[in-house]
Amino acid sequence: EYVEHIDLNFGCPVPKVTRHGGGGALPYKQNLFRKIIKSAVGAAKDEIPITVKFRMGIDDNHLTYLTAGKIAEEEGASAISLHARTVKQLYSGQADWVAIRKLKEHIKTIPVFGNGDIWEAHDAVEMMRVSNADGVVIGRGCLGRPWLFKQLGEIFAGKEASQFPTLGAVSYTHLRAHETPRY
């Protein structure tokens, strides 16, 4: 009753995780990937949506995203998200928004969200235009930019995105975040 959804995030590219077959490397192990999703969906019993995030693959020679997306769809995931980079890329280079489009064309019954290189509201609009994704997943782009979510809401509501906050407003926001009690 306290959980709105569970995201199975197979997007971690950090070598200390992937060299042991975890994180972004796990979808390469298709049977294990399938078992994890099937188990999570089964345990949720249609009460909690299970979403799955993954990368394009280990590297350009080991792309797994189309198969991973199909497995997630077949096993009952409610939605999938693609970080449009390989594990090898880590966070370098440009996200391949065309890969998100290919995944969107490959998946027929669940929403496909795109992730990667969303730093400003107009980036999200452009990613959705290029990829035809059903939505965006914001990662590093919101770190230090909490106003990004407000701007995204404005843009997707058909309004102009508000201006970037002043230095004073940013300082105040960060100060408040550090003063807020953690429970």
Mark where each language-model region is:
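Alpha/beta enzyme core
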Residues: V3-I6, F10, P15, H20, ...
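Glycine-rich beta-to-alpha transition loops that act as phosphate-gripper elements at the mouths
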Residues: F54-D59, P111-H122, R140-C142
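Glycine-rich phosphate-binding active-site loops on the catalytic face of alpha/beta enzymes
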Residues: A133-F149
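C-terminal helical cap(s) of enzyme catalytic domains, especially alpha/beta-barrels
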Residues: R145-E160
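Acidic, proline/serine/threonine- and glycine-rich low-complexity intrinsically disordered segments
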Residues: A169-S171
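Conserved small/polar residues in nucleotide/adenosyl-binding loops
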Residues: T173-T180
